[in-house]
Design a protein with these regions (language model features):
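Extended, highly charged
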Residues: 1-666
């Protein structure tokens, strides 16, 4: 379904009871974000919010994509899987053998459909150009400031248009924009992004780079801008496919080489000069739940701003999960499962990106396994597949027994307890965990080097005979070790989560206050030498400010803070007398000695003093007390129902100081 514009989408949301209008004055600086954070975490994503009284000429739309239902409405489908099924059908149709002329002629209607999705450039002006600011001034837009330590207000749902100067190929992406003055913002494109490649090409040619930013319009545009498409595939073709109608584009007024959606609410036109000095941009409370720290990025000079007469300013916030962006990620997970399966990993059955993994940190993949080593084959293929190159932790699962002909176990990978039992039943910590390194998201603060760090694959697939180490001692008996670990002997341990252990999943989570170099390595060895720990296959360590028994938040912190290649500690010992084997013995063992193994993973905060970590470590994102109090006091006026306390309250004591950079000592 194609929406004529954002206003039609707003009406549809309101008709379905998915939107609340807020008529009380709410400040775009921090207050809109605090209200949205409460609503988005209130269960099932809450409602979309239309702030009609912001002190500006334009209302602000928030949380429009923040639930499965609203995400489906934005894409015009009943279920997110519907898109994947349609894409898979197209792939099969195009790739199937055509035996005669009749079969080939049957393709013609489908090729006609392809043509109907291609974007079209209109010669007339668009709705987005109904009003032209004679003196462009982005500060007249209600650009929100999301978090107290942000560097300023940021445009958070910008649909950014650039072109390759050599091929004229368009790219549409989404990169935050910090507002510095009336006609100047930052342009936060990372080095891996296509727009950054375009920037570098303009730099080689010593040419000014035209750029245009759209806000609003059909809600599918913002999704298409986030989609992980191949470099030379036009995002507006994807948008046309999703809305079943081609996107109509118009030429910009001051940057006529760039075309933008006719139905957008706002267009911000301008340029980036490759010869400009870069600007110090940030901090910004990012989708990882941590601040991304300041760095140098290009300047975007605004040359024109146009908008519709009844324009609505769309925005989003990101931060500690879950947030609205989780549903944009879920749509990508579902939509791009079919292309991955049809082009790169044919054995893939399903894929899941848990919200605690904030997209790249944790991906679970279910495969149909048919031969030994297939898990490693999938691992390498996945890490080479577009934006999957940023993945940190990959968990593989498959059928429970290869001899059963590859039949899948009767659980979905979203059933996490059953999944974990399956994975850890089939996983030998000494042989089935693989480490690598490569490109990482620039926002990953755990890497010792910016954008380059460790990766880990946990192969939880059922093993063929060739993959099994017969010397591994599989222990079925597991002990509740929490009482032992929470004694005076382990004063550095603040909490222990044995909830998984109690469900026969051999994993525990331990919260530790580090006080010396090598503390986690030493502690892991000490714990593993206890007889009661012999059945445990993995121990996850988090920092002392984290409640290990708050499973979701502990996993979120753990995944963010781990560099798997740097932060792993494999303990391996003889089963008979618990004598620890050396690392060399682990890697080159030839004797027939039964052993057990436990993998330790250090997901604590890293510092210069204790870990020789040389980069700044960011703080988690928490609202300030003044903003929390202001929203508490005006809650009854907002029309949002029962009072919802600030989600930030549970995290206030987990901060290290008050700045975006965490204090080294606290």
């Amino acid at each position: 379904m194609a929406y004529r514009n954002q206003q039609e989408f707003i009406k549809a949301l309101e008709k379905e009871g998915e939107l609340v209008r807020i008529k009380t004055y709410v400040d775009p600086k921090l207050e809109i974000a605090e209200i949205t954070d409460r609503i988005s975490k209130s269960g099932n994503g809450g409602k979309a919010l239309l702030f009609e009284n912001t002190g500006y000429d334009f209302p602000v739309l928030m949380n429009a994509y923040g639930s499965e239902r609203r995400m489906c409405m934005a894409l015009g489908v009943k279920h997110l899987n519907d898109v994947a099924k349609e894409i898979e059908g197209l792939f099969k149709l195009l790739s199937s053998p055509k035996e005669n002329i009749i079969d080939k002629l049957k393709l013609l209607p489908q090729l006609g459909r392809f043509a109907s999705w291609m974007p079209k450039v209109k010669k007339s002006i668009g709705e987005c150009q109904e009003v032209i600011m004679m003196k462009p001034d982005i500060t007249r837009l209600p650009v929100i400031t999301c978090w107290p330590k942000d560097g300023g207000p940021f445009v958070t749902l910008p649909i950014i248009h650039t072109k390759d100067p050599n091929t004229n190929n368009r790219n549409v992406g989404m990169y935050r924009m910090q507002v510095f003055s009336e006609r100047l913002t930052g342009m936060h494109w990372h080095k891996h992004k296509v727009s950054a490649k375009h920037f570098n090409e303009y730099k080689k040619l010593n040419k000014i780079m035209p750029v245009a930013v759209a806000l609003g319009g059909d809600p599918v545009y913002a999704y298409a801008a986030t989609a992980p498409l191949p470099e030379n595939v036009d995002e507006y073709m994807l948008a046309g496919f999703l809305r079943k109608k081609k996107v109509e584009l118009v030429k910009c007024i001051s940057q006529p080489d760039i075309e933008v959606p006719s139905d957008a609410d706002f267009i911000i036109e301008g340029y980036v000069d490759p010869n400009d000095e870069l600007i110090w941009e940030g901090p910004f409370g990012d989708h990882t739940g941590y601040y991304s720290l300041p760095d140098w990025y290009p300047r975007f000079h605004i040359t024109a701003i146009t908008h519709k007469k009844n324009a609505v300013y769309p925005a989003t916030i990101v931060g500690i999960p879950p947030q609205e962006d989780a549903w944009l990620g879920k749509a990508t997970e579902r939509i791009f499962l079919a292309p991955i399966k049809m082009t790169m990993v044919p054995e893939i059955v399903d894929m899941e990106m848990p919200v605690e993994g904030v997209f790249h940190n944790l991906v679970i993949t279910q495969i149909k396994k048919e031969y030994a080593g297939q898990g490693q084959k999938v691992m390498n293929a996945m890490w080479g597949a577009g934006q999957m190159m940023f993945n940190k932790i990959l968990v593989l699962t498959a059928s429970p027994n290869p001899s059963e002909g590859g039949a899948l176990e009767s659980f979905k990978i979203t059933e996490y307890e059953k999944l974990a039992k399956h994975v850890f039943k089939n996983m030998n910590p000494a042989t089935d965990i693989y480490f690598s390194q490569g490109p990482m998201d620039v926002l990953d603060h755990s890497c010792s080097k910016l954008g380059f760090g460790g990766k880990m694959c946990i192969d939880g697939t059922a093993k063929f005979e060739e993959e099994i180490d017969e010397m591994y001692d599989v222990r079925s008996e597991m002990y509740d070790v929490s009482e032992i670990l929470l004694t005076g002997k382990f004063s550095e341990i603040k909490s222990v989560n044995v909830s998984l252990l109690q469900k026969q999943i051999p994993v525990i989570i331990i919260s530790v206050e580090k006080s010396k170099k090598g503390h986690i390595t030493e502690l892991h060895k000490t714990i593993c030498e206890m007889k009661e720990a012999e059945g445990i296959k993995m121990i996850l360590y988090v920092e002392h400010t984290v409640d290990a028994n708050d499973l979701g938040n502990a996993l979120w912190r753990f995944c963010n803070n781990l560099d798997p290649k740097r932060d792993n500690m494999l303990y391996k010992a003889q089963s008979s007398n618990n004598r620890a084997l050396t690392t060399s013995h682990i890697q080159h063992q030839t004797s027939n000695i039964n052993y057990f193994a436990c993998m330790g993973l250090d997901g604590t905060r890293k510092t210069k003093e204790l870990d020789n970590f040389q980069r700044d470590w960011p703080n988690i994102i928490v609202a300030d007390e003044k903003t929390i109090k202001a929203i508490d006091e005006k809650w009854d006026q907002l029309g949002l129902g029962k009072f919802i306390p600030s989600p930030s309250l549970k995290f206030k004591e987990q901060m290290y100081g008050e700045s975006a950079v965490s204090l080294q000592k606290i």
